[in-house]
Amino acid sequence: MESSKKMDSPGALQTNPPLKLHTDRSAGTPVFVPEQGGYKEKFVKTVEDKYKCEKCHLVLCSPKQTECGHRFCESCMAALLSSSSPKCTACQESIVKDKVFKDNCCKREILALQIYCRNESRGCAEQLMLGHLLVHLKNDCHFEELPCVRPDCKEKVLRKDLRDHVEKACKYREATCSHCKSQVPMIALQKHEDTDCPCVVVSCPHKCSVQTLLRSELSAHLSECVNAPSTCSFKRYGCVFQGTNQQIKAHEASSAVQHVNLLKEWSNSLEKKVSLLQNESVEKNKSIQSLHNQICSFEIEIERQKEMLRNNESKILHLQRVIDSQAEKLKELDKEIRPFRQNWEEADSMKSSVESLQNRVTELESVDKSAGQVARNTGLLESQLSRHDQMLSVHDIRLADMDLRFQVLETASYNGVLIWKIRDYKRRKQEAVMGKTLSLYSQPFYTGYFGYKMCARVYLNGDGMGKGTHLSLFFVIMRGEYDALLPWPFKQKVTLMLMDQGSSRRHLGDAFKPDPNSSSFKKPTGEMNIASGCPVFVAQTVLENGTYIKDDTIFIKVIVDTSDLPDP
């Protein structure tokens, strides 16, 4: 960028920026405002630095002053404030938007600076205040380019030349036709005389005896000109004769036999076309009949689809009733759990009583041995403590059983999809390595409320071929309440998946179709069948070095395809 002093020198050539009209409210005078940055006008005297923007280094336009005392153009300040942490380009102080204000005093001083007219290069020698530039260009400058006042003319001329252009040089000025005396734009005068003027003298194009006539009379003359070419009235039937009106009459009188033959040929051709149309009509009728048959077939299919829709609606209603029934069961379970909660509270109370009794026993044991009655009381208290301990044990067992049942109900799914969350991966993996707990079973899941009962089984340290190197994942069919109503062997497609907990979601998965001859997919005779799946599902190095483990937790997903599964 050139320095501001070079740009402000009186002899420097400058390119003025695009301008928009803006009203100075403080002075009531219209002034020019650049679209961006400060003024690039040619000033008569070198402009002081205090009148220049600290960002664009041009003469300030609508100056704004910051808290640190530096000035910026309004558009430059807006650009600075659009950043996340605006700073003054002069002193690097932070700029606070609410503490930036308009510097109207500086603005008035700048608008009073003397400049050369923008049209100096065209010959204008005017020197004026910057604030008067717009009025000068709009009303007074003889060297300002203005558009021609005629709407169709696109030329621009200097204000001093505008009158001569409009009256003498504009191609769209009015001109008078020398033949018809009508007013025509100068640019269209020649075309008017050559093709349109009705008063221009023309000759007959057929070289008849009439040599001169007006263009307005030509149309009527051509309709009766003896030399005008014409065609035989039997042209549509194949006659190609052409000539003057007199020749046409003589031809028609002498060629009657030829014309009759042409009529015969035309009639024969017409009969052939009628025959073809009849054949086409027969084919069309066949097509129409075929389309009618298709429509009937479609109507039958639509009725069948409607019946299927009604059946599906009844199934949906049945499922809704089942869901309502399950909701009622959950409510009943909640009611059953409430007494156990009360028992738990009673157990807490009993524990407090036991602690109190133990304290009393301790006190009694420290009393003099001669107190025989105390010994008997101690025995009685010990028996009471024993009964309380038994009751607490029973309550603990019943609460644990209810908690297990409730957890199974909470985590069970009935859409053929299992998402199994395995916490404490490192501890469980170490237990598998040490041989304490080789495998883990997931909670059961189902293909429907009355469908197959299934679960997943995982070996964190691998099994068989994958032992010590891989995670082994298997699918297990369990004995369900509704197995008697389901088709066997189990045939649904199974997808096993290890879920990626990172943002890329690059899950690892494998899918298989059950082998109908395998005992793993027969109807269970025990609690569950033999597991079937992938001994080398994923290498432990891949599992433990990726984003498959977060917060010492992994997620395993099993999907059973239920799309073709019939209702029981």
From Swiss-Prot:
GO biological process, one term: defense response to virus
Positions of region ((Microbial infection) Interaction with glycoprotein N of Andes and New York hantaviruses): 392-415
Keyword Electron transport: no
Variant or mutagenesis effect after changing residue 338 to W: In IMD132A; likely pathogenic; decreased TRAF3 expression in response to stimulation with lipopolysaccharide in patient cells; decreased expression and attenuated TNFA production in response to lipopolysaccharide and M
Localization (cell): Cytoplasm; Endosome; Mitochondrion
UniProt comment concerning the protein's domains: The MATH/TRAF domain binds to receptor cytoplasmic domains.
Subunit structure: Homotrimer. Heterotrimer with TRAF2 and TRAF5. Interacts with LTBR/TNFRSF3, TNFRSF4, TNFRSF5/CD40, TNFRSF8/CD30, TNFRSF13C TNFRSF17/BCMA, TLR4 and EDAR. Interacts with MAP3K5, MAP3K14, TRAIP/TRIP, TDP2/TTRAP, TANK/ITRAF and TRAF3IP1. Interaction with TNFRSF5/CD40 is modulated by TANK/ITRAF, which competes for the same binding site. Interacts with TICAM1. Interacts with TRAFD1. Interacts with OTUB1, OTUB2 and OTUD5. Interacts with RNF216, OPTN and TBK1. Identified in a complex with TRAF2, MAP3K14 and BIRC3. Interacts with BIRC2 and BIRC3. (Microbial infection) Interacts (via N-terminus) with New York hantavirus glycoprotein N (via C-terminus); this interaction inhibits the formation of TRAF3-TBK1 complexes.
Name of this chain's protein: TNF receptor-associated factor 3
Organismal lineage: Eukaryota, Metazoa, Chordata, Craniata, Vertebrata
